[in-house]
Amino acid sequence: MKKKLSHVTPAGQPTMVNVSEKKATLRTARARATMNVGNEILSMLSDNEIVLKKGPVFQTAIIAGVMGAKRTSGLIPLCHPIGLDDCKVEINVKSGKIVIETSATTVGKTGVEMEALTAASVAALTVYDMCKAISHGIVIENIMLLEKRGGKSDFTA
């Protein structure tokens, strides 16, 4: 059987998925964004030298990521508004890159993949915004879902 897009009607029109008949269950998701910021910024971040006019980079990006997750349904048109029970954003430097890992949790009728992905994306965009005065050569790479649990199926990358 051919798979179908869940947010498109048979007539090709966008539609929100009706979740009214679903039971509320525990839903979790984890996502990651990787950034290549170059050696100059990386060494400044590693040495805690960067506290810019806009504030401390990683701490600001963590807050921005959580805020982004909470506002996902306002950014992605057909995404259901959900009550997040938890959202975490961790930022580390690994193998010469910035690695942003996020998690989102709810008990609800729909998953939290988009919230975890939005948290990772917004945190990465915030790092870019705060460091662009040093270099515009920053690259946000590999924004990806690592895992989702709950609902019809589970997924692990």
Predicted stretch roles:
Residues 1-80, 84-157:
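C-terminal binding/interaction regions
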